[in-house]
């Protein structure tokens, strides 16, 4: 067996800086060199393998196994989810009901500062709570484009909106996982999320309005945006404190915020109606509104997304035990070890690394979306031939972006199995009493590398808890800070960027989306970091 070495250069800070080269390289490739996401991923993977093997001593066979593991996890479940989500969207468009979708949104408000809150913030928050894995980013970005938003701007707004709900995605898995890894009570950690994160959740709608329309937007609809954020965040606080449940934190509050916002819009509209430059003009929208749609037609138009919501919620809750390893349908899950990695690596703490791949054919979220797509085909005017034609178009649209996702996951796995990610975290952990200031940065790095708040918590929740005990800070605070920093990292994680780009048919434009989004991710990270440090001084 090979044991990970976290300080191969006998200088913790220098070793960490070398370990961070892939993260820095990926960002520079996208933002400075303006390379496509695919080229950036290839370059970063090559450099990561060289550093992992030559500097950190990762055996070549383990490096190959890490890449294999990355490709498998990138293809399934992530690639499968993206493929099915985009196919469902294309089926919905091909079915010919999108004029009704647009009209139904415009009937609530023609102001696109509010439309983005309805779709990306509220509806997207609910989808994140039910499914996660980038599904709300893909679906909401595509819906915004259908309303006339610029594709790249729609992607950025969907990514930023996702920061409000990313901590509790897929029925609260990031928090429940963090509690398990850090040996904390789940209800206690859920309550601990409140002071760390929820002031920032409340201001996300304000940020989205400011991005669209600057100070004028804040003056005209800022109060409504803030109220939406407070209801969303306040609902999450209520669920976390009184129910002690992170599982429902992205289910009830987004729907509550959506209903309240729609009710407000039924009684009030801004004097100045904001339209995106690329969207249909107000006159064109009003002309379209002259065509009356019945309630049945509106439900029919939205039915693909209703089916999506129902199926992913069922897959995540009621049906989940059926797909478990010991469940009636567990036989549909094939699990096998990753050669060169499984039980071939020992961590610095002496723990043997297990690395397996589980092909959960029935229980995957992508399969839930497949069911929603099949129901849509059966209940709409689209023929099977047209549906399969759309699938072919979807595959041609996604094959390169899915390859990029596989490469990104390979980078993450090489860094993890080589001990590079842990090297960065351990170096930051030497900051002593200043560590709470850097705690969210570790979560940010974890999500940037892995693309998942859950994975970042698997990697670092234990480190955060241990370091907290050493410096006399409540472990709950730092584990919560790790999660909070992670959701800010999701805004620019290569995996999320790739999903957003492909959803709006802008594959190859990842560098532009990253450049547009990174400043907001950085600002939110700085705010969370300073706030976490202040909390550590106040409550310890």
Positions of predicted regions on the chain:
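Structural signature of hydrophobic alpha-helical transmembrane segments
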Residues: 7-21, 74-78, 130-136, 187-202, ...
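Hydrophobic mid-bilayer segments of alpha-helices in multi-pass membrane transport proteins
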Residues: 18-28, 35-56, 79-85, 225, ...
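Juxtamembrane helix-boundary/capping and inter-helix hinge elements in multi-pass membrane proteins
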Residues: 35, 93-98, 110-111, 144-153, ...
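Membrane-embedded alpha-helical segments and adjacent helix-loop junctions characteristic
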Residues: 64-73, 78-147, 156, 381-467
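Alpha-helical transmembrane segments of multi-pass membrane proteins
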Residues: 113-125, 151-164, 187-205, 406-407, ...
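Juxtamembrane and boundary regions of transmembrane helices in multi-pass small-molecule transporters
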Residues: 167, 171-280, 484-540
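Active-site loops and adjacent core secondary-structure elements that bind or stabilize anionic groups
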Residues: 237-329, 348
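Transmembrane helical segments that form the transport core of multi-pass membrane transport proteins
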Residues: 291-446
């Amino acid at each position: 067996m090979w044991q990970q070495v976290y300080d191969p250069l006998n200088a913790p800070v220098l070793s960490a800086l070398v370990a961070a080269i892939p993260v820095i390289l990926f960002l520079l490739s996208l933002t400075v060199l303006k390379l496509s996401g695919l080229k950036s991923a290839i370059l970063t993977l090559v450099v990561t393998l060289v550093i992992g093997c030559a500097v950190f001593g990762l055996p070549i066979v383990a490096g190959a196994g890490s890449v294999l593991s990355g490709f498998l996890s990138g293809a399934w479940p992530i690639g499968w989810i993206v493929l099915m989500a985009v196919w469902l969207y294309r089926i919905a468009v091909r079915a010919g009901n999108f004029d009704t979708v647009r009209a139904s949104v415009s009937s609530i408000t023609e102001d696109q500062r509010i439309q983005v809150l309805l779709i990306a913030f509220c509806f997207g928050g609910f989808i994140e709570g039910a499914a996660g894995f980038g599904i709300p980013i893909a679906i909401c970005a595509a819906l915004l484009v259908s309303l006339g938003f610029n594709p790249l701007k729609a992607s950025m707004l969907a990514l930023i909106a996702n920061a409000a709900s990313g901590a509790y995605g897929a029925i609260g898995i990031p928090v429940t996982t963090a509690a398990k890894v850090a040996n904390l009570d789940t209800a206690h950690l859920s309550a601990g999320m409140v002071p760390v994160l929820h002031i920032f959740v409340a201001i996300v709608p304000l940020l989205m309005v400011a991005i669209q329309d600057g100070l004028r937007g804040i003056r005209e609809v800022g109060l409504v945006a803030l109220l939406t954020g407070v209801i969303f965040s306040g609902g999450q606080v209520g669920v976390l404190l009184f129910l002690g449940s992170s599982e429902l934190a992205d289910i009830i509050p987004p729907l509550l915020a959506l209903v309240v916002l729609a009710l407000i819009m039924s009684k009030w509209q801004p004097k100045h109606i904001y339209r995106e430059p690329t969207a249909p003009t107000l006159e064109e929208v009003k002309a379209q509104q002259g065509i009356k749609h019945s309630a049945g037609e509106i439900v029919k138009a939205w039915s693909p997304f209703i089916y999506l919501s129902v199926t992913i919620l069922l897959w995540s809750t009621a049906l989940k035990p059926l797909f478990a390893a010991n469940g009636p349908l567990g036989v549909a899950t094939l699990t096998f070890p990753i050669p060169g990695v499984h039980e071939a690596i020992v961590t610095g703490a002496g723990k043997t690394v297990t690395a397996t791949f589980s092909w959960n054919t029935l229980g995957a979220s992508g399969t839930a979306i497949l069911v929603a797509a099949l129901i849509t085909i059966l209940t709409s005017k689209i023929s099977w031939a047209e549906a399969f034609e759309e699938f072919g178009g979807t595959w041609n649209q996604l094959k390169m972006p899915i390859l990029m996702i596989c490469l990104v996951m390979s980078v993450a796995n090489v860094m993890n199995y080589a001990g590079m990610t842990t090297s960065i975290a351990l170096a930051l952990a030497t900051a002593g009493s200043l560590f709470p200031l850097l705690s969210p940065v570790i979560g940010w790095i974890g999500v940037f590398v892995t693309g998942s708040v859950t994975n970042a918590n698997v990697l670092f929740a234990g480190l955060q808890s241990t370091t907290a005990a050493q410096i006399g800070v409540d472990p709950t605070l730092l584990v919560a800070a790790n999660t909070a920093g992670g959701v800010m990292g999701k805004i620019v994680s290569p995996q999320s960027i790739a999903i957003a780009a492909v959803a709006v048919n802008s594959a190859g434009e990842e560098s532009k989306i990253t450049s547009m989004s990174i400043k907001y991710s950085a600002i939110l990270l700085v705010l969370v970091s300073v706030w976490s440090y202040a909390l550590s001084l106040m409550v310890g």
